[in-house]
């Protein structure tokens, strides 16, 4: 491992891109797009919503592009993403960025099998600058909390929603809400009820 980067910094770039899009283009609806499961659902079942997904890279893609541009010494290195999401692999394939999707649960299994305890190693800093605003991005409502730090007023025009029991029904009704001018400006949505931190690639039930 040549370097370790924190994707929270990329999340700040993602949120900034959202806000610039809202300010510059005045859309009537912006759907958060870091969750590949929701994007894939819209591609298959709700293509009418695709034009409303935020035209911005996910935090992971922002981070990888940042590495390529500002750390050229790693240009030839492959990128392994420590991820809470089994669906992230689809994003790698579709965009051509990212080489390995190493889920947190898989990493934990590998460490346990080899009797490796991370607590026995010294702490080290990330190789990129620390995030200031987006450290909570991967938790439910993290996008909204990050955006509020720049624009507090956006909270009144945002719908925060997560969890497979409700999110897909909501997406199914969203185009109708838009036509009736009842849709929020920003939809902060995730497939997993506990946010990415409790994603399908984590061991959150035993944590």
Where are these regions (language model features)?
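Iron-sulfur-associated redox domains of electron-transfer enzymes in respiratory
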Residues: 1-207
């Amino acid at each position: 491992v040549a370097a370790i980067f924190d994707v929270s910094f990329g999340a700040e770039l993602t949120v900034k891109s959202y806000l610039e899009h809202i300010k510059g283009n005045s859309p009537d609806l912006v759907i958060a797009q870091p969750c590949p499961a929701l994007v894939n659902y819209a591609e298959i079942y709700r293509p009418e919503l695709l034009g409303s997904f935020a035209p911005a890279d996910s935090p992971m893609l922002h981070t990888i592009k940042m590495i390529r541009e500002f750390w050229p010494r790693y240009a030839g290195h492959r990128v392994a993403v420590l991820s809470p999401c089994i669906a992230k692999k689809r994003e790698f394939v579709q965009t051509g960025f990212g080489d390995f999707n190493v889920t947190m649960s898989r990493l934990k299994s590998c460490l346990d099998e080899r009797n490796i305890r991370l607590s026995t190693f010294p702490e080290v800093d990330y190789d990129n600058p620390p995030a200031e605003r987006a450290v909570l991005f991967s938790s439910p409502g993290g996008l909204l909390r990050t955006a509020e730090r720049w624009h507090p007023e956006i909270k009144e025009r945002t719908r925060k929603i997560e969890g497979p029991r409700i999110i897909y029904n909501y997406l199914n009704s969203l185009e109708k809400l838009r036509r009736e001018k009842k849709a929020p400006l920003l939809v902060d949505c995730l497939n997993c009820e506990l946010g990415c931190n409790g994603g399908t690639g984590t061991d959150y039930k035993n944590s």
